[in-house]
């Protein structure tokens, strides 16, 4: 049978399916040349989400948070990872473990 072994793709699928379950219309977006993994829209509100396995270096953090930092509106921006700690944010962008994200 078919088996996905790419953990990053599995994590993205979890986030995508959770957003669908919550009733969001989902798009992949770009801001300039920067990809935004998911832009969810529901009832006139937006949510921007980047998905990464881990934020284990400044370069990874710069890439994941940097794409969202370029968006100049006041809608929520979240980086979802498989990390287990919670509560961190970076310049107003929330860093959320997947387990916590799925319970919201």
Give the positions of each predicted feature:
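A cross-kingdom feature that marks ATP-driven nucleic-acid transaction machinery
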Residues: 1-104
């Amino acid at each position: 049978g078919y088996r996905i072994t790419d953990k990053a793709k599995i994590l993205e699928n979890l986030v995508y399916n959770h957003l669908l379950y919550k009733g969001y219309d989902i798009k992949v977006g770009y801001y300039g040349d920067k990809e935004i993994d998911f832009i969810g829209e529901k009832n006139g509100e937006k949510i921007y989400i980047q998905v990464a396995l881990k934020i284990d270096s400044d370069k990874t953090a710069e890439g994941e948070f940097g794409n969202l930092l370029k968006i100049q509106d006041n809608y929520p921006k979240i980086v979802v990872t498989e990390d287990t700690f919670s509560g961190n944010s970076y310049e107003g962008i929330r860093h959320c473990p997947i387990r916590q994200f799925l319970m919201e």
